[in-house]
Amino acid sequence: MVRANKRNEALRIESALLNKIAMLGTEKTAEAVGVDKSQISRWKRDWIPKFSMLLAVLEWGVVDDDMARLARQVASILTNKKRPAATERSEQIQMEF
């Protein structure tokens, strides 16, 4: 059970890391790290799953505030929530036909 929980946590961490790389872009990530972009592609395949498991075993969670904010924005768009009017109700224009 503990192993399954760690594996699930590792998958969550791996997903968060891959999403962050995707949001930033492979080229910008590689530039920030100081490696070629092909190196980042290899890391995604070989190293990130291993590091994710290590982070899960060490209980080193990845805080993903950006992804949470993005998820809220997407949910808002999908539910078509209208923004509240910036005016008082009496100041709004009414058209009658």
From Swiss-Prot:
Positions of the DNA-binding region: 26-45
Transmembrane stretches, start-end: none
Superkingdom of the source species: Viruses
InterPro entries attached to this UniProt entry: Lambda_DNA-bd_dom_sf (IPR010982), Transcrpt_activ_CII (IPR007933)
BP-aspect Gene Ontology terms: regulation of DNA-templated transcription
GO MF assignments: DNA binding
Key word Mitochondrion present: no
Keywords recorded for this protein, A-Z: Activator, DNA-binding, Early protein, Transcription, Transcription regulation
Family in the record: Belongs to the lambda phage CII protein family.
Function in brief: This protein and protein CIII form a complex that is involved in the initiation of lysogeny. The complex binds at either of the cy regulatory sites preceding the CI repressor protein and integrase coding regions and induces transcription of these genes.
Protein name in the entry: Regulatory protein CII
Protein source organism: Enterobacteria phage 434 (Bacteriophage 434)
